[in-house]
Amino acid sequence: MATQNNHKGITRRRFLSGLAIASAASVVGTSLLAPRKAMAATDAITGFNGEVLCGSHWGAFRAKVVNGVWTETTPFEKDPHPTVMLDAVREVVYNPARVKYPMIRIDWLKQGYKSDTSQRGNNRFVRVPWSQALDFFQHELNRVQETYGPSALYAGHTGWQSVGKLHNAGTMMKRGISLHGTTLGKMGDYSTGAAQVILPYIAGAMEVYEQQTSWDIVLKNTDTIVMWGTDPVKNLQVGWLVPDHSVYGSYQQLAEKVKNKEIKVIHIDPVRNETMKFVGGEQLPVHPQSDIPLMLAIAHTLYTENLYNKDFIANYTTGFDKFMPYVMGETDGIVKTPEWAEKISGIKASQIRELARTMAGGRTQLVGGWCLQRMQHGEQWAWMLVVLAAMLGQIGQPGGGFGFGWHYNDAGTITSAGPLMSGFSGVTGVEPIYNGSFKGYAKTIPVARFVDCISNPGTKIQWNGSEITFPYMKMAIFSGNNPFAHHQDRNRMIKAWTKLETVVSIEHQWTATCRFADIVLPATTTYERDDIEQFGNHSNKGILALRKIVEPMFESKDDFDIFRELCARFNREEAFTGGKKKMEIIEEIYNGARLQGRGIGVRMPTFAKFWEGDGYIEFPAGKEWVRHESFRNEPDLEPLGTASGLIEIYCKTIADMGYNDCQGHPMWFEKEERSHGGPRSDVYPLHLQSCHPNNRLHSQLCSSTDFRATYTVADREPIYINTQDAAARNIKSGDLVRVFNGRGQVLAGAVVTEDYSPGVCRIHEGAWYSPLDGGKAGTICTYGDPNVLTLDIGTSQLAQATSAHTAVVDIEKYTGPVPEVTGFNGPTYETGIDPLFPAMDK
């Protein structure tokens, strides 16, 4: 049964706007509408006509509702630079991939945990009543805990989910499942897994999610900005909370200063990215995965030309004397000269020296992204960026130093003077029903190694200074999470998946993770429930009511109600809810911020006035801020969180771990595979980038049918390829191509462009896995999931993070029968099956 298509037709103007989303002009809009009063949540009922204020990862907006149907979306007037992705948000509610009903995989319904798990992915499901689905869920929780213990139950995989302080899918899952029993958890994430482990050792904090120096200060004080593997104009369209997009005004000012030659911007990137197109500047098209040789050569130049800051090195760092012998070749016989680096990086020695001199010749801000730490030995890049900033000696000064979060969460905006809201957290003081022993197995695992854990139970690995033993995972629960998008080496993952006895997915879109689940429960979208959220991420500009726009579609339920009903089955309903209804919790969250506001002089209206009124409060402006300023001004009183309190160029803690792939100081390690003359480039000559998309948030919005049509090529995810590489393969823009390596193959639509250096191609991550032969490892992906092609190995023994950007491929024009894209139509409904078949008794 298909969702009724109530979508309004997309005009040519809107269509072209979607096509142009990759350009900065389409990202940065103009001021919008005059304020309008939002409606109360109680009005969001069938037959309602009016406007509703709400928010999303893509910004705040007003939804026009006609006879209970959401028909139009208008950006919130407080957002000066809304993203075109707001056009796709309505389709999250209305699209063929909605999870409509509780569904059970057909063979699991027949045989329970003894089912033929090789059938997972064939997309054959049976609709069942909610009561039966939740009974199955509880039965499996009990069975796994009683049969194997907590180490066999994995309920730690969380991700972006949806905005809202109450309806956080991961929090709901952890709160509900932890009342039932302890489970295997995870550490780290896929975005910053390597950097977030190593940087606390080196710089004393995780750094990747931190607020950055205020842009006003940078624009006043900086001479040179080095953007290293980052594309903030593309990535700032989305936010962890509801972005206000005010930061784009700073990029407009930067573009003007670059144009007037007041600030120099240097982009170290093999791609002429959206930020470069928007702000201007110079490009150094470094070969992929060769940034460390380039950085070491810069360090060599700073040292040999006496351009480094000796006072800063002496007073704010430790270990420089142990690092420089490596740079000078005294430890391995290789002097890290610009000539040495040129052969690997493709950047001329003269350019490397000039770059070092430019960086040392004035105030320099190093702006690092996250892609470069998502490759094998990714820890080294994060470490080395801090080392270069230390050698320049400008850390803690206005407009100088380093930062790893400029492309994320409105970074560089001035944080308001307002309070912060809490959320719906875990339960304390209530003993779980099942609290068994882990029997020596790990209680947590590095998240990017969870498929390793499934594949190789009992294996011991090194991780961040400890040895852990993978448990025998038997059941996995995913709520608002799509590992069949963000994990690497899809075919390896499919093979591992057969070892799981039961998989539960709680979702509102029928993702590939649902296809490979046994129990699928339909959740509401953000737009079918009431909630509250912060407007602006680092800016904390205000508080926004997230009002229900339409009634829940089909049989979807809020995550709150799903886990409340599950907890009722084991007598923990009141512990889960805290004895409160959903709106009472939202009011409690608001009142907590209101009380906090009183203490800092910020007056807020009562919750009733807020919710029934405009549904938006704006906080007073805060003050400008310089990252690491307190450390620079008073290093003894404000030390970093490292072992020494200083920046650790050489880290004894890491050295003492004894890892050969992450030693006591930053080093160059060759990769398993690398383009431009590296390993396996003779077989697969093209480096595959799988960066964050400019049309989605990871895999979110990929199911928005009309919006997807504005950027697909030949109905597939685009692959961007250099003109020389395309000509050598007789490929033109618009061609359907096969992208392949030894791990798998995908179809994609070619976009031939000079923006990409020779030997470099890109498919944005988050493209939905759409197998030709569902559930079969090795089958071609009909839409273009890049993680069919990526390598699933840890960055090193330190972080064990994802190495997605260590991947080489080849491309050819596709000449076979053209298959339909399989990924966006929901499940195959099997009928004639008794929906009350007692699989739990098997």
Segments from the language model and where they lie:
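N-terminal leader/propeptide and maturation segments of large enzyme subunits in energy/redox metabolism
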Residues: W108-Q132, L307-K348, G436, I549-E648, ...
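Long, well-ordered, tryptophan-enriched scaffold segments
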Residues: K259-H267, V271-G361
